[in-house]
């Protein structure tokens, strides 16, 4: 292997952790900085915040100076997100949602996001969680589509016009191969 392809394992990390660090943290750095333009003092919503890229987004969001709201599916996962640095947590119900449940989740997201909404939403989950999250985005916010294990999201694009926001796909592997 060329030396340029090697990375030093961070102190305190096992080889098993090291094997996943490049993918999870590389994806997340690309998402938050290159695609989401996250800046100090902004508000970040992380869906699936206890998964690999979700926890990376919580940790990196805090390191970049953002207020981080972590959305997860259980109290145990909320505790993991808090341990990673989340300022606030939301425990959401499991999908699928009916219309009332979707509205209720959007209200939870909005309440936690505050008056201005979220500057950046990091979504590695998709499915029924995407629309309620998009409804909580702030003016000119950035919605990052990182994955969709809960299903391909269906978003009403009129929301992007009403919020003057961006929806960005994040595919770090293709980005890294092209650059």
Residue ranges and their predicted role:
Residues 1-48, 96-97:
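NAD(P)H dinucleotide-binding glycine-rich loop of Rossmann-like/cofactor-binding domains
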Residues 25-26, 48-58, 127:
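Glycine-rich NAD(P) Rossmann-fold beta1-alpha1 loop
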Residues 34-38, 112-115, 135:
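Glycine-rich helix-loop-beta junction characteristic of Rossmann-like nucleotide cofactor-binding loops
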Residues 46, 62-129:
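Adenosine-nucleotide cofactor-binding segment
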Residues 57, 61, 160:
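Short hydrophobic alpha-helical segments of the AMP-binding
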Residues 72, 81, 128-179:
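Glycine-rich phosphate-binding loop and adjacent beta-alpha segment
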